[in-house]
C-alpha cells in the first residue's frame, strides 16, 4: 500500500507543479520504509481511492496550505489518513460526503460531480475496509481515514 500511496502522491505533486499551485503534499512515510504494509487488493482501484481523496483535499485547499498523508497500522488494519487545511465540514455533513452526488462544497471552491468520495467508499468497502470523515481536532480542515484489513 505504501508504494501505491507514494506513486499517486508523486503524480499529484507533478500536476500541482504544472498548474502552478503552491499546495504541499506531505507524507510521513520515509521513516516507515522498512515496514511491511501489505493488503490484498486491486492496485488500480486502490490508486483510484487515493487519487479521489487527494483530489478532494486539493480542491478544498488554497495556495500555501498543506495536505498530510500518513499510513499507520493497528493489529488488524492499515490506516491511511489524509488531512487538509480547508474549511472542514459542517457539523451534520462528515458522513454525508460519501453519498452519491452529495457536495459540501462552498461555491468559492468550484463545481464537482459529488461522485469521487462515493466511488472511494465503494472501493474501500469492496476491499472489506471502512472509510470515515471528520473535522481535524483543534485545527482547521478535514480528515479522512481509510481502514483496510492487512495480511
Language-model region placement:
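A conserved beta-strand-to-alpha-helix junction within the catalytic ATP-binding
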Residues: 1-13, 29
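Short conserved segments within the C-terminal catalytic ATPase subdomain
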Residues: 15-30
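Conserved micro-motifs of the catalytic ATP-binding
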Residues: 34-41
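Short helix-loop "hinge" at the ATP-lid/N-box region of the Bergerat-fold HATPase_c
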Residues: 57-58
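Short conserved segment of the HATPase_c
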Residues: 89-101
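Short alpha-helical Gxxx[C/S/T] motif in the catalytic ATP-binding
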Residues: 116, 120
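Conserved glycine-rich
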Residues: 129-130
